[in-house]
């Protein structure tokens, strides 16, 4: 593992030993925005990080001899409360010749979401600089699950035209914040927007309302029986994409709950076919 530190942190932070590289972009003292987290970062269960105060990328290099030039930033889910690292997903992308970077982003910490968005956009921009990894800057996309799915769609709308990701792949992503009804969603909203948030804030960060003709091409995966994030969230996002003429594809599995693990082989095949459709992987 190679560790590249672009800034120093006064707090104890987490690096992941399984990655080919760990790159720190910044922390609360060196970034433009802060999430005001003062506690040390901590593992509380396997592959789950809490109390983040710095942005790091855990990079898994594309398999030798298979490099497609594509890179993907993976935004972990965890209700904006913690980050559940998807190691197997990163390893699968790497095996397909796609450089994968799990983004340890700064959690919003009860309303400081500017830091979260800064980290997500910074990850995309950083990957575009890594020509030494064989990355084509025009082939950098994003993916994420649940809250990470929300962040991936947010990035695809918030980044300036000309900088947007080449593709977006939300996995059971949280989209419609202002109509979220579950207790889990309410807790996530407090983490994202802060205690005592008003409904307008939830509307402003509902990403289906951000979509325009410049939104990145998007491939959505949902499960019909998801009780945490209703599949209608993804449907609303898909409909917004279609209305604005954005390339889009949506797959709703009949079962699986708040996960697509039961459909791994299917969704992985569909991802590769989507990337071929976009012209990012050449047909053989």
Indicate where each model-derived feature is located.
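Short beta-strand element of the alpha/beta-hydrolase
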Residues: 68-77
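Catalytic nucleophile-loop/oxyanion-hole region of alpha/beta-hydrolase
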Residues: 82-85, 89, 101-139, 261-266
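Primarily recognizes the serine-hydrolase "nucleophile elbow" in alpha/beta-hydrolase
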Residues: 122-184, 202
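C-terminal catalytic histidine-bearing segment of alpha/beta-hydrolase fold enzymes
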Residues: 235-284
